[in-house]
């Protein structure tokens, strides 16, 4: 479905500024590799789309100056993007002098939509139709299977995805999924005990069923992309997602860190302390997840409301014990928490900061911040970043 010219906003200065990005100056992930000649065209395509996405509407001449590409290259690429329906001409800039005002171009932000899926909730799978700027336009959810049944989990996910594709009002650019577990870059879920998946080709299977591009990542890795792209995070940080389980995503040098086994950030089953503790679902005693998961903290608080400060302080201390070596080894500047503010904000964060500073080098890591994310729907927005990166080279 296309958008007619009379439905598009006029290309005023206010419109251009507003559309630079819905959440402010989003940033892109940096590449650590040199561009080979045979890859130059793909690099140039991504550079142009990246510039338009983050900077907003501009003329072809502006785009040439901003990217350093020749005007001929820009003209060829823009013509290709317009033919593909990715870029649109949105009017002319207000005249400020003699001569013909330049035509402004931008990503077709209203001409495509993204489907985002979050499988990390304790009782439901969440899904949304999102704009290219990460705004949630429509949302739906389906109950999460009560037991780890891989077939039932996939059936529920597929039904939710199909519903969202049907209610999308523009062509779907792709589907992004944030799922618990260890996920390879090709979208194969190596292990997700909570969903009953082992070596499950989630990305390939759903793509075949929907006939759409699908990208699947660990839910914390999706969340960290959203925090970096749309949030206020630095170039080196960790995001800890606290919900049914506990997991982390890491950005170092403006690049996601996945690890050799694609399990970087799997901190939930690190044993914290030698004083025993609650038994974890994995069978071990004293895993971080057994101390820090939302259900565990809430159960402890319900059992002894008078001990609220002590319970939350202990949880924050255990978390800091687990992450202090990571903060020091990677020289991270901040730790961002995603989860219920009523549990994480205040006492828990204060205890984490105190313990983190006590367990790292004095005078070096004293400015490391621990804070809550200010974003809602962080996994869904991370799913949008995944699709933008995979389909357009935009991140």
Region roles according to the model:
Residues 1-141, 147-171, 230-231, 274, ...:
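ATP-binding/phosphotransfer module of carbohydrate and carboxylate kinases, centering on a glycine-rich
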Residues 117, 171-178, 182-283, 287-288, ...:
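Phosphate-binding/catalytic loop of phosphoryl-transfer enzymes
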């Amino acid at each position: 479905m296309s958008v007619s010219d009379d439905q598009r906003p006029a290309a005023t200065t206010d419109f251009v500024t507003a559309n630079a990005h819905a959440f402010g100056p989003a940033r892109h992930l940096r590449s650590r590799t040199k561009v080979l000649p045979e890859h130059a065209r793909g690099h140039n395509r991504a550079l142009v789309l990246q510039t338009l996405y983050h900077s907003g509407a501009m003329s072809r001449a502006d785009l040439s100056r901003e990217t350093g590409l020749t005007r001929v290259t820009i003209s060829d690429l823009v013509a290709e993007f317009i033919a593909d329906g990715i870029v649109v001409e949105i009017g002319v800039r207000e005249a400020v002098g003699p001569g013909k005002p330049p035509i402004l171009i931008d990503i077709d932000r209203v001409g495509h939509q993204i489907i985002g899926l979050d499988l990390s909730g304790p009782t439901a799978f969440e899904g949304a139709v999102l704009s290219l700027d990460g705004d949630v336009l429509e949302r739906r959810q389906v109950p999460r299977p009560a037991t780890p049944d891989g077939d039932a989990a996939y059936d529920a996910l597929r039904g939710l995805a199909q519903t969202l594709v049907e209610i999308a009002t523009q062509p779907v650019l792709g589907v992004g999924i944030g799922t618990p577990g260890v996920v390879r870059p090709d979208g194969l879920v190596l292990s997700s005990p909570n969903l009953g998946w082992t070596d499950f080709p989630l990305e390939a299977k759903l793509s075949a069923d929907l006939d759409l591009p699908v990208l699947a990542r660990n839910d914390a890795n999706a969340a960290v992309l959203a925090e970096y792209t749309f949030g206020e995070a630095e170039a080196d940080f960790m995001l800890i997602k606290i919900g049914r389980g506990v997991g982390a995503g890491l950005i170092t040098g403006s690049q996601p860190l996945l690890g050799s086994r694609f399990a970087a950030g799997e901190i939930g089953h690190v044993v914290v302390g030698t004083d025993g503790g609650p038994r974890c679902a994995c069978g071990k005693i004293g895993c971080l997840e057994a101390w820090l998961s939302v259900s565990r903290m809430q159960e402890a608080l319900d059992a002894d409301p008078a001990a609220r400060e002590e319970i939350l302080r202990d949880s924050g201390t255990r978390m800091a014990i687990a992450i202090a070596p990571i903060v020091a080894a990677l020289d991270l500047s901040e730790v961002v928490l995603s989860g219920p503010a009523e549990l994480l904000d205040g006492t828990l964060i204060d205890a984490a900061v105190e313990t983190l500073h006590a367990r790292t080098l004095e005078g070096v890591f004293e400015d490391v911040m621990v804070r809550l994310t200010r974003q809602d729907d962080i996994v869904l927005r991370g799913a949008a970043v995944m699709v933008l990166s995979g389909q357009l080279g935009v991140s």
